[in-house]
């Protein structure tokens, strides 16, 4: 593992463009303004390089000189500590604990439902997207309280929920009715950030706030 990592003089991210966990890490790297190289990996054909670095062959995998990290949460928290500006986690332990719990709940409650929408049958997709839409609309008041998700500043929690909302939009979900204005405002605010656009490599949508 060490010899393979030492061959790389610049930080390298092994990534799949469609993977939501890789997307999280790309947002953080863009927020931090970190120079890095991307090794695009087909998750169905894991390269020998990746297997030498990461015995699980999972994505994302980050190589920073002789350090190899996998698991998006570990990578993102490392990047936040390694490059402290701008900070993406609260300063105080209680607030940090709450942020970690929010990330865990988003990952455990919503990511599996999104996976059903992306990989399931048409019927399973419809059911999964309906569930996601209804559950997010149910917490719409949260989006009115602060500019970002339960925070005055953009944070790692946003790096969890923004890729989810982006994929829902790509799958045709439209938020309408009670609470939708606040959700659309949040989506526009996050999707128009330079870091989010860089994470996609394309322009963010400009029509989210058309319906007011």
Swiss-Prot record:
Q: Which domain of life is it from?
A: Bacteria
Q: Where is the GST N-terminal domain?
A: 9-87
* CDD domains associated with the record: GST_C_SspA, GST_N_SspA
Got a GO cellular component term for this one? cytoplasm
Annotated GST C-terminal domain ranges read 92-212
Q: What does this protein do?
A: Forms an equimolar complex with the RNA polymerase holoenzyme (RNAP) but not with the core enzyme.
Q: Which family does it belong to?
A: Belongs to the GST superfamily. HSP26 family.
Q: PANTHER family in the record, alphabetically?
A: GLUTATHIONE S-TRANSFERASE OMEGA (PTHR43968:SF6), PTHR43968
- Under what name is this protein listed? Stringent starvation protein A homolog
- Phylogenetic lineage: Bacteria, Pseudomonadati, Pseudomonadota, Gammaproteobacteria, Pasteurellales
The gene is sspA
């Amino acid at each position: 593992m060490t010899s393979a990592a030492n061959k790389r003089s610049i930080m390298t991210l092994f990534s799949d463009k469609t993977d939501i966990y890789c997307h999280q890490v790309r947002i953080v790297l863009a927020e931090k303004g970190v120079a890095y190289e991307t090794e695009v990996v087909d998750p169905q054909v894991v390269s020998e390089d990746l297997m030498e670095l990461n015995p699980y062959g999972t994505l994302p995998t980050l190589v920073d000189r002789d350090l190899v990290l996998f698991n998006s949460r570990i990578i993102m928290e490392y990047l936040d500590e390694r490059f402290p500006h701008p900070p993406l986690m609260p300063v105080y332990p209680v607030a940090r604990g709450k942020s970690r719990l929010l990330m865990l709940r988003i990952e455990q409650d919503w990511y599996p439902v999104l996976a059903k929408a992306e990989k399931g049958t048409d019927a399973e997709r419809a059911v999964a997207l309906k569930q996601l839409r209804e559950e997010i609309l149910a917490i719409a008041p949260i989006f009115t309280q602060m500019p970002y998700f339960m925070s005055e500043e953009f944070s790692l929690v946003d790096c969890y929920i923004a890729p989810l909302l982006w994929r829902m939009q790509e799958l045709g979900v439209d938020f309408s009715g009670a609470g939708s204005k606040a959700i659309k405002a949040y989506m526009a605010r996050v999707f128009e950030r330079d870091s989010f656009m860089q994470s996609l490599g394309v322009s963010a949508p400009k029509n989210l706030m058309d319906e007011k």
